[in-house]
Every structure is written in structure tokens, then in C-alpha cells.
Design a protein with these regions (language model features):
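Short, polar/proline-rich extracytoplasmic segments that appear immediately after membrane translocation
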Residues: 2-71, 163-167, 172-181
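Extracellular adhesion/glycan-binding regions together with long Ser/Thr-
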Residues: 2-4, 8, 63-69, 121-156
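A surface/secretory-pathway sequence property marking extracellular, secreted
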Residues: 47-56, 93-132
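Short structured motifs
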Residues: 57-67, 76-79, 95-96, 129-137, ...
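Glycine-centered loop/turn motifs
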Residues: 67-70, 133, 163-164, 213, ...
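C-terminal, structured domain-capping segment
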Residues: 74-90, 97, 135-180
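Collagenous Gly-X-Y triple-helix signature in extracellular proteins
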Residues: 180-610
């Protein structure tokens, strides 16, 4: 009864409900219930945790009819409810899996299927191609429920003969329950075989080792837990990767307080780091005290220079402690990139970590990577994950699934399924234009598995008509090689790109503003649909080890003969515009773009639709 044929008769499709509840204890319970017709309620209880699923009516599809979205959305749909009637929080995901078909039958290719998933008040949902079998992820506190309406139809935009083919699926719900645990308690209970808890410092309990289970995902970024403050159980984090790369300060000024770096970290503007953190007053200690004392040693510094800020950097002692139970700088904080520490070495040099993991010092005018550090409040709790890189700890209140929400409500660093082939992952940068969402490719563009190199142009000024601008606003945008037509329609027609010059040792703000006060925008601008990131912009860093990445262009000139580029080792230098570098296309998506599914992490990026 599942065959698609030319008679255009209405068919009932069999939906198999596979409900899996996975507890934090690692025990899995599974039920397989075959639903064909009628009204049934299936309820699963494990201890005090239970999900209920109500099947209100069977799913129908018009056989042989390729429906417009407007007609597909008129279908009654398949209704079900997921409810947490236990006492604890539970996260869950909804999958649309292939069900078994009979011998001799042929399964319809997913490209022919469109679907919508209405959720709660949004009973309609957004028409979406079936490109991912995970169609929803979310979480429920005790007594909460989510009500869904699933509609499926054949996609009229796809040509092909599917006569006699079969579409048969099963609805799978995976649920996970963990008792919310304070971050400090979870870490102190153990960080895996490749890490150790070190209590030799009475003021900081350090996590040491080569690769402890201390990964945390928060506000669109992957962090490592570094230490616990025994006085209040707050937890110090640092980003795993370089979020950007800027000069530390002007020549001869190595103090953290008042530096370019302090400004960048604590910038609350629309494109600032702190301004793009999720609910900082809820998650982090905004009055954290940072030891920025100058020292030539790597041992614990005196408390000579203490700075109060929401965001800081790790000092050289904290980095050194991470290597305590490792050899040859193989500690977990060595990310094989160049990055700044908080610690001045002298009045002319600041401590930084090299790509091999050794500590060195250099002029503050040089652009090294920025790895922001924050202190989580003691009340923040872990709700999911196991602390590994593939399954980082998730924080209660930051573990939502914003299906149906506007992309413009989300956070810098979150991942988006966008683009095609090997260039199909992008990240949110900011909401610089106020209504839409600025995004950039997660890595420089690739071509046949290798990074694509391109000249900047004949001079240092980016326009849609110079070499790289012509490519970005031509072949990249229109050829179909890098973007689908639906994705192109999500992009704003025009964006203003800021082209301010940032000379050696000058403030990163000059890339966008006339001066360091940020009171007036630079007059050096251009208009184009697709551009690049500028020096110091969020996500203008490196997010893999040196050797797995490549150099790439920014928009920002150094002077009349050089353009700033982000090197594979994580620092910013400059290159002649006639040289070739990688490119990370950047653009503003329209304010109407919505999230269809996904949680925004690298392994489960947001799927979006206009």
C-alpha cells in the first residue's frame, strides 16, 4: 500500500515508532511499536523519568502528486506529542529513519521528499528538503511537552520517474536524561584517563594532562575547563581555538588594562566578543579578577597587577600548569597555534604561546591569536555530554533546540548547514546589520579536497570587481558549485563592507571605525553581496591545528602595498594582493531566515530556510 503510482489515490503510510530512552547511567531501553491506524498513546517510564508519545492520526500522502509547498502544508499531517512526566530535565531528538521494505521494492530517493514539522504554536512549520534524517532536537523540563505536526509530500522541483517506488519511514525518538550537575562537581568527579585533577595550588584546582574530558560547548564556541576556584566553585574556561587575531597593544605598552586586547575581549557592541556571548550575566562572573602581573618566570606570579573584567586571557602560569602531567608541551591547552597570554614579559614584550607549545615573548604590536577566557558561575550546571571533543558537556540553559526561531536570535560561532559538497558548513559571525545574520564559511573554500587559492587583486582595496571580489560575487554566488539557488535567495542583496586600514601596532577598531572611540564608522567602504571578514572580527581566527588549515585573506589593508591575512599558524601578517591565499566568503542572511532543525554544534548544525 506504500507504492507511488499514477492513480493518484490517497494512501496510508505505515509509521514505525521507535522510542529510545538513554539514561546518564548508560542504560538503554527501547520499544518498537508498529502503528498503522487508530489512536494510541505509548508511555515509557524509567525510574522517575518518562516520555509519552501520543499518535493522534495516521499520516497520509497523495500518491503520485507532486505538491506545491502551499498545498503540502494544507495536509492534515501526522500528530504526535512528546511529554516529560518525570521529575528531571530530558533532552531528545526526533529522527525520520528508513523502515524496511519488501524484496523487489525500490525506495524513493530523499531528494523527492519535502516535509514540514510544526511545533507547538507554530503548527505549520517550514517546508524543507529531506537532507537530514534528524528533524528535531530539543529538551523538556519536568511536566513540559512538545506537540508536533509532521507533513510529507513529493517535491515538484525535482524531476524523475518514481513510479512504483516506495516511501516507508519510521519515527525514532531518542531521549537522554542527566541529572543537572554543577560544572565544578562534574569535573572534580573525574576528567578521564588522559587528565588529572591537581590540588597543589590552594587557590586554583587545575586540570592537567594531554587530553582530559573537559570540553564544554557554550554560546557557539568550544571551550576547555582549566581550573576550579575552591573559594566559590567557579570554573575557568578558555576557548579551544583562536577566535580572532589582533595586536595586543601599541608599541612599548604591554599592560593588559587599557590594551587593545582588553577592549576586544570586553566589547559589548553588536560585533564585540562579550556582546555576542549568550546571557553573560546568567552564565559568567562578570566581575572576575585576572592576574596580569608582569613576570619573566612561568611559576605562579605575585598579585601585583590585578584587573577586574568579565573576560580575560590565561596567564602564563595557568598555561604552564596544564602541561604538568605531559611532556614536550603535549598538554591539552597547546592547540598548535600562536596565541596571546595575559602576562607581560617586560615593558616591551608580552608572553605568547607558539605553535609547538613553547612559551615565548614578542612585541605587543604583532597580531597573535585571541583565546578568550571566562569564569562560569558556580550555579551553572551540566545537563548533557561526556566532556569529550565529539560530545562536549552542554550547559543547562544553553542546550536548546531553537526550531522555528529566527536565525537572527542565535549566537556567534554556532554552525549552519549552508553551501554544498565539501564547502557545506558555515558559522554565525554576528548580527552587525541589526536585523539579519552575518555568516562565514567554517573553513576556507576547498576544491577537490584541497584549499582553493586566489589572488586578492591588483591593489589592496576590496571591491566586487577586483580579483577575489569578482569570484565571490560571480562564480561563487551563481555557478551552483558552492551554493544552491535556495541559499542564494537567503542572502541580502547588498552589504556594506568596511575597509579601514590597520597599520602595524594600531588599534583593530580602525578596520571599521575612524578612530578607537568607535564613534564614527570609517568612510572606506564598498558595497557587495559577498565579502570577507576583516581583521579582529569574530570568527576571523583559526579552528584547527597548524597544517590542517591554510592562510586566508581578510578585507583589511596593512598599508598601500599589503593586505592582512590570517596565517595557518594563527597569527595575522600581511601579503601582497598579487599573491594567492585562501578565502572564507562572508555575507548577511536576510532577517526572515528561520531554523528548521539542528542544535548549532558542529556535528548537528542548524538547517535553515527562508
Amino acid at each position: 500500500m506504500d507504492k507511488i503510482n499514477s492513480q493518484r489515490k490517497k494512501l496510508i503510510i505505515a509509521i514505525t515508532l521507535l522510542i529510545i530512552i538513554i539514561l546518564g547511567l548508560g542504560i538503554t531501553y527501547a520499544w518498537l511499536i508498529q502503528i498503522v491506524n487508530g489512536e494510541k498513546i505509548q508511555s515509557m517510564r524509567v525510574g522517575t523519568f518518562r516520555f509519552s508519545l501520543t499518535e493522534e492520526n495516521s499520516l497520509t500522502i497523495n500518491s503520485g502528486e507532486f505538491l506545491k509547498d502551499s498545498d503540502g502544508l494544507k495536509q492534515e499531517g501526522f500528530k504526535f506529542t512528546v511529554q516529560n512526566v518525570g521529575k528531571g530535565y530530558g533532552s531528545y531528538s526526533v529522527y525520520l529513519d528508513d523502515d524496511s521494505i519488501s524484496s523487489g521494492q525500490t525506495r524513493i530517493d530523499d531528494k523527492f521528499i519535502r516535509y514540514s514539522l510544526g511545533i507547538n504554536a507554530d503548527t505549520t512549520g517550514t517546508p524543507t528538503n529531506l537532507t537530514s534524517r534528524k528533524i528535531y532536537s530539543g529538551g523538556l523540563d519536568a511536566s513540559e511537552k512538545d506537540t508536533f505536526v509532521l507533513r510529507l509530500w513529493l517535491n515538484p522541483a525535482v524531476n524523475g520517474d518514481i513510479g512504483g517506488q516506495v516511501f516507508k519511514v519510521k519515527l525514532r525518538i531518542e531521549a537522554n536524561q542527566q541529572i543537572p550537575t554543577p560544572v565544578a562537581d562534574k569535573l572534580l568527579a573525574g576528567v578521564g584517563n588522559n587528565g588529572t585533577i591537581d590540588t597543589t595550588d590552594p587557590e586554583q584546582t587545575f586540570i592537567t594532562g594531554t587530553d582530559p574530558n573537559n570540553y564544554i560547548w557554550y554560546s557557539g564556541k568550544l571551550w576547555r575547563a582549566v581550573s576550579i576556584d575552591p573559594s566559590d566553585n567557579s570554573v575557568k574556561l578558555v576557548t579551544q581555538w583562536n577566535i580572532s587575531s589582533i595586536p595586543y597593544n601599541a608599541d612599548g605598552n604591554t599592560a593588559f588594562q587599557g590594551s587593545y586586547m582588553e577592549q576586544w575581549l570586553n566589547d559589548t557592541s553588536v560585533d564585540g566578543f562579550l556582546g555576542n556571548l549568550r546571557e553573560p550575566d546568567k552564565f559568567i562572573k562578570t566581575d572576575s579578577v585576572w592576574n596580569a602581573t608582569s613576570t619573566t618566570e612561568t611559576t605562579k606570579p605575585a598579585k601585583t597587577t590585578m584587573v577586574t573584567d568579565a573576560v580575560g586571557l590565561l596567564n602564563v602560569y595557568e598555561y604552564t600548569m596544564s602541561n604538568k602531567n605531559a611532556i614536550d608541551f603535549t598538554g591539552y591547552l597547546n592547540n598548535d597555534l600562536y596565541w596571546w597570554t595575559l602576562t607581560p614579559y617586560s615593558t616591551s614584550n608580552v608572553r605568547n604561546v607558539y605553535d609547538h607549545g613553547n612559551v615565548n615573548n614578542c612585541s605587543p604590536t604583532i597580531s597573535r591569536g585571541s583565546r578568550p577566557s571566562i569564569n562560569l558561575k558556580s550555579a551553572v550546571k551540566i545537563i548533557d555530554g561526556d566532556g569529550t571533543v565529539d560530545n562536549p558537556y552542554r550547559l543547562q540553559g544553553d542546550n536548546d533546540s531553537p526550531t522555528g526561531a529566527l536565525l537572527s536570535t542565535r549566537y556567534s560561532g554556532e554552525y549552519i548547514s549552508f553551501g554544498t559538497g565539501e564547502n557545506n558548513l558555515y558559522r554565525i559571525v554576528s548580527h552587525e546589520n541589526g536585523t539579519g545574520t552575518k555568516i562565514t564559511s567554517a573553513i576556507p573554500l576547498k576544491e577537490s579536497s584541497s584549499y582553493k587559492s586566489i589572488k586578492f587583486g591588483s591593489n589592496v582595496t576590496f571591491t566586487k570587481d577586483n580579483t577575489i571580489g569578482t569570484f565571490l560575487n560571480g562564480d561563487y554566488l551563481t555557478s551552483g558549485t558552492y551554493l544552491t539557488s535556495d541559499q542564494v535567495n537567503m542572502i541580502e542583496d547588498n552589504t556594506t563592507w568596511y575597509l579601514g586600514t590597520v597599520g602595524s601596532g594600531t588599534n583593530y577598531k580602525l578596520a571599521k571605525y575612524q578612530d578607537a572611540t568607535s564613534s564614527s564608522l570609517t568612510t572606506s567602504t564598498t558595497t557587495a553581496q559577498i565579502g570577507l571578514l576583516r581583521l579582529g572580527e569574530l570568527m576571523a581566527g583559526q579552528f584547527d591545528i597548524y597544517g590542517n588549515n591554510t592562510d586566508y585573506w581578510t578585507l583589511t589593508p596593512l598599508d598601500a602595498s599589503g593586505v592582512r591575512d590570517v596565517r595557518g599558524s594563527g597569527h595575522v601578517y600581511d601579503s601582497s594582493p598579487t599573491n594567492s591565499d585562501g578565502s572564507r566568503p562572508s555575507m548577511n542572511l536576510k532577517s526572515t531566515v528561520k531554523i528548521v532543525s539542528g542544535t548549532g554544534i558542529k556535528s548537528d548544525p542548524f538547517v535553515i530556510s527562508n
